[in-house]
Amino acid sequence: MSREVPANGGDAADLPIFTRRRAIQTAIVVFALLVGIYFLFPKLVGLGNALDRLGEANPLWIAVAIGFNALALGTYVALFKAVVGGEAMPLSWRETYEINMAGLAATRLFSAGGAGGIVLSFWALRKGGMPRHEVARRMVAFLALQYVFYPVALIACGVLLRTGVVSGKDSVELTVVPAAVAGLLLLAGLLMALIPPDVGRRLAALARGERSRAVVANVAKAPAIVGEGLRFTAGLFLNPSRGGLAVLGATGFWAANVGILWATFKAFGVHVPLAVVVQGFFLGMVANLFPLAPAGVGAVDAGMIGAFVLFGIPEETVFPAVLVYRLVAFWMPLPFGVVAFFQLRQTAQRWEDEGLPFDRPVTIKNEVPTADGKKAAPEAPISARRPRK
């Protein structure tokens, strides 16, 4: 019989990201942005309708792009299972798929910067019985391992392009500036990893009065968890035997996404240097953080188009290539994500009826790799733990 985990996530119907009003608002915004980017703007700049050249695409290269997309989704699921599932909470591959694909739909339909997917994943893991603190710590590690490739790619390609090691436009604004900003962000992440887990206690000791100490301790919880998650991420990198699948999943996810874009350019008979594809891809994806566009719809399209035009790629090729990329990488998986959301609701109900994943027995101890290359002291087997909030 499964133990009860207090406040394990609430009912699926209470998820704020899935409401009829939000869906209608999102549909209107998405439609307006897509019409503006792919119909109105090309006409204003004298390029005609961006859809006119879609019929010229080579079907073989479109098939290659779809294959890369399947690889991207598979590696994304593997990344999540390696960081969040496994011995931490023995999720099956099907359960991991449902959480990830449902989160993908939430991210792409209801929020910018991935927040919708984070909310849904947090809910699902809490429904599965994982303690709140552990969910937060592992979600930080999952996101950090996934997005660390942003600054790394911008730095690497920026330096290679600027120094002429690889072919492509080497202007400062497309190479040095992005690399410098990425370097600062990477440095900030490394410094945050140094935040000690007891930072709240240390800072509270400096505050005056019980109320002030309580406020300081509560505020410090978030950076403390971020620090723990980042150190966990570093441990995965430094322990290939434990973190190999996670690192491979994150690497494969971004490599496959870049592969989709590369294949769509090939579909229109245009050769774009690989370093330019990577740099333009990540520069465009920064627009995903644009707050008014759901999952960067319209903003990412415009960002990628602008980046490649600045790199000297002909506008009449950039528009259809980016459009096809977004159709394959963004819109094609969406129906699967919506179906996975409803499957996940049924799975969450089954967990409550048949037992929580967090209660499932495991054959190994929950040893967590640390950044110094050592394994943390083993805890009790998961199935033997007492309920925790």
What are the functions of these language-model segments?
Residues 102-112, 265-267, 281-301:
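Transmembrane alpha-helix interface/packing and boundary motifs in multi-pass membrane proteins
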Residues 201-237:
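Membrane-interface interhelical connector segments
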Residues 24-28, 62-66, 93-98, 175-180, ...:
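Hydrophobic alpha-helical transmembrane segments
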Residues 75-102, 264-279:
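Membrane-embedded helical hairpins/re-entrant loop segments and their flanking transmembrane helices
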